[in-house]
C-alpha cells in the first residue's frame, strides 16, 4: 500500500503559474504559426525532447492507450511521426484513425493538443526519412517486433549484433513493417498557465475551410 505521508504530500504539491498569459489579440490567424513559435521557444529553452508528444489512440473496445513519440515533420497537411507498423498504436490507428496528440511543455507552463485523423505516409516519404536516421537506429528498426512479449533484453541485443553483421555492407534496407503517419489538424488547442488557476486556453477549429478561434474556460 502507498505511504500515507507520501499521499498527503502529493495532495499538496502545487505552484503558481507566473510566466505570462495568452491574449486573443496576440493570436495569429493560423494555428501552425503559433505552434511553430512555441516549438521554437521550447527548443531555445533547451527543454528535454521538445518534439516529444503523447499519442493517444483507442482499441476496438474503446480502451484508450497513450505513448510518447517524437514529432518528425509538420506543415499545413499535418504532423508526422514514424513507428513500427506492427505496433499496438498502428493496429489501433488502422481500426480507428481518429487520434489525439499532446505536447507537454511543462517548463514553459504550456500545452498544445491536436485532434485529427491519421493516415499512412507514402513509401517515398518513409524511405527518405528512414535513410536519414543514424545507421544503428536503422538496424534497431529491424530488431524489435514492437509490443510483442520477450523473455529478456539479451534477445534484442543478440539480434542487433546479428543484423549489424548482416547489413555490414551497403545500405540498410527499409523494413516492410516500418512506416509513418500524418495526423491532419482538425483542432489545435493552446494552453498557457495563469495565476490563480485562471489559465488561458484557445481552440482553433476548422470552419468552412477557415480557422475559427474560441477562448475556452480553464
UniProtKB/Swiss-Prot annotation:
Gene3D superfamilies for the chain: Electron Transport, Fmn-binding Protein, Chain A (2.30.110.10)
Pathway assignment = Cofactor metabolism; pyridoxal 5'-phosphate salvage; pyridoxal 5'-phosphate from pyridoxamine 5'-phosphate: step 1/1; Cofactor metabolism; pyridoxal 5'-phosphate salvage; pyridoxal 5'-phosphate from pyridoxine 5'-phosphate: step 1/1
**Biological process annotations from GO:** pyridoxine biosynthetic process
- Cited Pfam families: PNP_phzG_C, PNPOx_N
**Co-factor: note:** Binds 1 FMN per subunit.
The record's similarity note reads: Belongs to the pyridoxamine 5'-phosphate oxidase family.
Q: Which UniProt keywords apply?
A: Flavoprotein, FMN, Oxidoreductase, Pyridoxine biosynthesis
Q: Which reaction does it catalyse?
A: pyridoxamine 5'-phosphate + O2 + H2O = pyridoxal 5'-phosphate + H2O2 + NH4(+); pyridoxine 5'-phosphate + O2 = pyridoxal 5'-phosphate + H2O2
Q: Which residues bind FMN?
A: 67-72, 82-83, 88-89, 111, 146-147, 191, 201
Q: What organism is listed for this UniProt entry? A: Salmonella typhi
Cofactor(s) essential for the protein:
FMN
Name used for this protein in its record: Pyridoxine/pyridoxamine 5'-phosphate oxidase
Primary enzyme class: oxidoreductase
Subunit text: Homodimer.
Which residues are recorded as binding substrate? 14-17, 72, 129, 133, 137, 197-199
Question: What does the record give as the function of this protein?
Answer: Catalyzes the oxidation of either pyridoxine 5'-phosphate (PNP) or pyridoxamine 5'-phosphate (PMP) into pyridoxal 5'-phosphate (PLP).
The encoding gene is: pdxH
User: Domain of life, per the record?
Assistant: Bacteria
The EC number(s) attached to this protein equal: 1.4.3.5
Can you provide one Gene Ontology molecular function annotated for this UniProt record? Answer: pyridoxamine phosphate oxidase activity
Q: Does the keyword Flavoprotein apply?
A: yes
Annotated coiled-coil positions are: none
